């Protein structure tokens, strides 16, 4: 929800007129609403799957973006509707027979892999995605979510903060 990947994901979905359900801690609720979340689930104090069922009238969600870990991906896959899909950047969920009954699709996202793949088509696709995202930022449809501007010498501290996976928005280093 409140992290960089989730924040961009929410905004892109809203730019495509999707209904967005996200999870975050209570302290970040207003922040994610400002980014476009229609429904916010406090993952620390609410049962995420129960809330998804409540919000979707028992149907489940069409799509899940999992950017945290395998446990979150496993929870996300349970919240999908029949024919839904999950995109994961931080570990794939466990696939069981029950999962296959839902006819879901699972996508492992490795954007950085395009750079090391020596696959020109993958690199071109990544460049086109970046170009489209930048157009959305320039047009004001997507916020760059810069929440912290740090100096070059503070990059190690910024990276330590990112490792906690509790950074809101994006940390940007100012290089003079």
Q: Where are these predicted regions, by residue range?
A:
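Non-catalytic positions within long, well-ordered alpha-helices that form the structural scaffold/packing
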Residues: 33-34, 77, 163
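Mid-domain Rossmann-like dinucleotide-binding core that forms the NAD(H)/NADP(H) cofactor-binding site
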Residues: 1-45
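C-terminal substrate-binding/catalytic core of Rossmann-like NAD(P)-dependent dehydrogenases/reductases
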Residues: 98-148
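C-terminal capping/lid region of NAD(P)-dependent oxidoreductase domains
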Residues: 138-148, 156-176
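Short beta->alpha linker loops
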Residues: 24-27, 43-47, 67-68, 150-154
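Glycine-rich cofactor phosphate-binding loops and adjacent beta1-alpha1 units
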Residues: 40-109
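Local beta-strand N-terminus motif with an aromatic residue
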Residues: 37, 57-61, 142, 155
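Glycine- and other small-residue-rich loops at beta-strand/loop junctions that grip anionic moieties
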Residues: 21, 41, 62-66, 122, ...
């Amino acid at each position: 929800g409140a992290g960089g990947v989730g924040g961009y994901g929410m905004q892109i979905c809203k730019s495509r007129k999707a209904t967005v359900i996200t999870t975050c801690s209570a302290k970040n609720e207003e922040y994610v609403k400002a980014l476009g979340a229609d429904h916010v689930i406090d993952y620390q104090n609410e049962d995420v799957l129960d809330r998804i069922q409540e919000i979707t009238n028992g149907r489940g969600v069409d799509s899940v973006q999992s950017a945290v870990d395998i446990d979150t991906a496993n929870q996300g896959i349970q919240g999908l509707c029949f024919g839904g899909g999950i995109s994961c950047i931080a570990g794939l969920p466990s696939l069981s027979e029950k999962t296959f009954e839902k006819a879901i699709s699972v996508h492992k996202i490795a954007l950085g892999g395009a750079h090391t793949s020596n696959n020109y088509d993958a690199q071109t696709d990544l460049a086109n995605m970046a170009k489209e995202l930048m157009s959305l930022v320039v047009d004001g449809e997507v916020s760059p979510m810069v929440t912290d501007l740090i100096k070059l010498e503070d990059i190690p501290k910024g990276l330590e903060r990112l490792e906690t996976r509790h950074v809101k928005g994006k940390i940007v280093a100012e290089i003079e």
